[in-house]
Amino acid sequence: ALSSAASDVYKRQDERIITIEDSAELKLNGIDNLVRLEMRNANAAGENQVDMKELIKAALRSRPDRIIVGEVRGEEALSMLNAMNTGHDGSISTGHANSCKDMLKRIETMVLMGVDMPVEAIRGQMASAIDVIIHLGRSFDGSRKLMEISEITGMAASQVALHPLFEMNEDDELTMRSELCDQKKLKEYGQYEAYQKLMEFFKARDQPVEI
């Protein structure tokens, strides 16, 4: 899913894309300026380990336009948030959680693995760094499906504000809840027309039929 999303979005030839993974598994096509970074386990003497936190810092020194982190599992989550907050719009990462809301809690936990930081500060970082959360899960028939998409719109009452865009209904069908609040970046990256067509499709499909 991450490979497909990145290959479809990162088509601008003037952008430098850096991927960070345990091992190079992402299949990215049509990206000319692509740099792959991989983690390295310690040797027999327990030395020369290169973890994801170090790779994110190395990636920032390489002046990327976008950073793709295969999966965030621990304290490197703070480094990823910092990267997203320093002019690297369009960066992508993945993590394990049961919903978009649970992913926010998961990020809080991961950040606190490495630093004693006020929760309010962590939430502020997330609110400014992350635009959208996409939740993939298992459907009733066992297949993997898109379950939920939510937009982060800032802070409200000391919490990260989630704005639901799409959700899976009881009939196992993805339905539109609302439109994006902030559409500026869609226009900046030439995705606004495609977004409008998508909205027209869902509005027409979900419109009640009079009998």
Regions found by a protein language model. Name each.
Residues 136-140:
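Short, low-complexity Ser/Thr-rich regulatory SLiMs
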Residues 12-129, 135:
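Switch/coupling sub-region of P-loop NTPases
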Residues 6, 14, 143-146:
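A structure-centric signal for secondary-structure junctions around beta-strands
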Residues 9, 101, 143:
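Loop/helix-junction capping segments adjacent to catalytic residues or to phosphate/diphosphate-binding pockets
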Residues 1-6, 10:
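Single conserved hydrophobic/aromatic residue that forms the stacking wall/gate
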Residues 5, 54, 79, 179-181:
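Short Gly/charged-rich anion-binding patches and loops
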Residues 141-211:
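NTP-binding/hydrolysis catalytic cores, primarily Walker-type P-loop NTPases
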